[in-house]
Amino acid sequence: MAMLPVAQLYARDVPDLRAPEGTDLLQVLWCPFDHPIMPRTALFWRSAATVTDILGTPPEPPAMQFDGYLPEPCLLHPEQVTEYPDHLELSTELQEQLRQWSVPQAAEEDMDPQTYYDCVLSNAPGWKVGGWPAWDSTDPSPRPCPECGTRMEVLLTIATFEEGDDEGRSWSPYENPAAEPSPDLDHFDPGRPTAVQIGSGYRQHLSICPAAPEHPHIELMT
């Protein structure tokens, strides 16, 4: 089964993309079937200067498990933001300090203080390079490198939705939110521009070893 292209990122466009020495291009592919609960991905680090045989339209597989495994082509406009760990990755003492600090702001949004911190302050929704995983559907789990045991870091988050749960849309991008999509895209959903769906609306995190990016990566759905 041919794998599908999912993302192509250039180091010149994405400051947080820490490419291995001698490379400046990351290509992410996946199999459009669950292995066992999400698509299995493959990472390719390359030098853009050596990529000469470019396909205008990548071939589609003869079959897919779900339509949500075929991404809609998108042109990226990366925006750099600052994130913080999910409250579940913090000490009990720091969680309590954040809870007390967030009470007034959370009340204005009619949200629980911990939910306010996670949704509005700590974790940006949508597709992203780097950052922290969100643990709203499962508890934090260790992510050691299978080769050397180093704690792995998130390389790429593939998300079902681009928008968060807060009504104020604190993570909305800079571009004009009222911009109209192309009339050719009558099925376009601004909350899901890639049309990708992970599970019932989750995220798929791809993590790599910071000591040796060539070590096998791991996948996690949250």
Residue ranges of each PLM-predicted region?
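Preference for intrinsically disordered or flexible, low-complexity segments
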Residues: M1-T222
